[in-house]
Every structure is written in C-alpha cells, then in structure tokens.
C-alpha cells in the first residue's frame, strides 16, 4: 500500500531478450503496479521497449556510481567498437544516453547517473536536458550533493537524489527509526538549501 503521491520504484536492474523482458515488465509494472523499474540497457532496444509503458517510468543504467563502472561504461569508442552509424565514437555511457532516446522520451524514461561522477553531469545534461536523472551515491559512497545539484539540475530540477546506506545504516540499535528519519531529513534540508 502506498500513500497519495508516493512513487514505487523497483530497482530490479533487469535486461534480457525481448520476450523475457516483456514478462519482467508485466510483473513489475502491471502485476506489482510499480511506477518505475531500473533496466540495464546493454542488450539493446528489444530488451528495453517492453518497459516503456504509458504512465510508467523505465530508468536506464547509464553511468553508475560503483567502482567497477569504468570497466565498461567509460569505454572509449573507436571505429572497431562503434560503426559509421555513430561517427563520434563516444564512451559507452554517452552512446547509451543518445541511442536510447529513440526508445522513449523524457515523460517515460530517466537515467541512472552516479553522484560520484558529478563532474560529468554538465555534459550529460547537454545530451539529456529534459530527462530526470536518478542519482545514487550521495552519502556513504562519497558523492557531493552540492555538485550534483550544481551540474545536474535542469529547469524543472530533474533530479531524484538517492542516499541509501547513510539512511539504512544510520543505526543498528533501537533508535534506528529516529536516526534514519533524522538522516533523511538532514539530506532533504541540504537539498532544499542547494536548490533554492
């Protein structure tokens, strides 16, 4: 059950062949009635399209905040990697941002861009100026909330900033609910300060 105005995001990070993706999409977005689901787009359009539904959000992994993301996401393109259909031979995450915009629009597709890569948000905003960005990595992973807002905000704010561990592990004692609430409120107040 959810309160009015609350959004349910299933951070499933799915991505499979078309038929299997269709089953995942139906399960998460229809049967479970989630509002959004995170999808790994690296199997291509047919793995993402089943998640593109009216009134729902597909959130594509683009540039994640984890250490190993540079193994693939920052891979520099070259002629052998990306053919003539993409002459600028971008890094993989940029190619994902550009290519995937053909599969949905800013009303049903957003992107995961880690706060630990805040300096890259300025360029990312030139590629996806109107899309929401889900930004994990503020808090325990060391991402700067101030830099995320500075470089990632668009005319409509356009940011969903996530800080999981700093809230989930605020305390292991009986005061967990109070400490987690204080941590969440503190983050919200910091966001308000940077946005206004």
Name what the model sees in each region:
Residues 12, 16-112, 130:
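Conserved anion-binding
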Residues 21, 44, 89, 93, ...:
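Generic structural signal for well-ordered, non-membrane alpha-helical segments
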Residues 25, 48, 97, 121, ...:
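Generic structural signal for well-ordered alpha-helices
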Residues 46-48, 67-72, 119-123, 142-144, ...:
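Short acidic/glycine-rich loop or secondary-structure boundary segments that cap or lie
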Residues 147-158, 169-196:
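C-terminal helical cap(s) of enzyme catalytic domains, especially alpha/beta-barrels
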């Amino acid at each position: 059950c959810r309160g009015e105005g609350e959004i349910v995001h299933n951070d499933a990070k799915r991505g499979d062949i078309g038929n299997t993706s269709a089953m995942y999409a139906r399960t998460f977005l229809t049967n479970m009635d989630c509002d959004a689901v995170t999808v790994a787009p690296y199997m291509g359009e047919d793995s993402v399209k089943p998640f593109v539904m009216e009134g729902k959000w597909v959130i594509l992994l683009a540039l994640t905040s984890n250490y190993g993301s540079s193994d693939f996401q920052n891979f520099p393109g070259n002629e052998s990697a990306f053919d003539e259909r993409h002459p600028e031979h971008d890094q993989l995450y940029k190619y994902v941002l550009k290519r995937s915009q053909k599969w949905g629009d800013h009303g049903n597709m957003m992107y995961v861009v880690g706060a630990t890569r805040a300096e890259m948000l300025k360029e990312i905003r030139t590629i996806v100026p109107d899309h929401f960005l889900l930004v994990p990595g503020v808090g325990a992973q060391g991402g700067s909330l101030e830099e995320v807002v500075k470089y990632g905000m668009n005319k409509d704010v356009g940011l969903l900033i996530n800080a999981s561990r700093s809230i989930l592990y605020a305390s292991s004692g009986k005061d967990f609910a109070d400490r987690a609430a204080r941590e969440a409120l503190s983050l919200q107040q910091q966001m308000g300060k940077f946005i206004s």
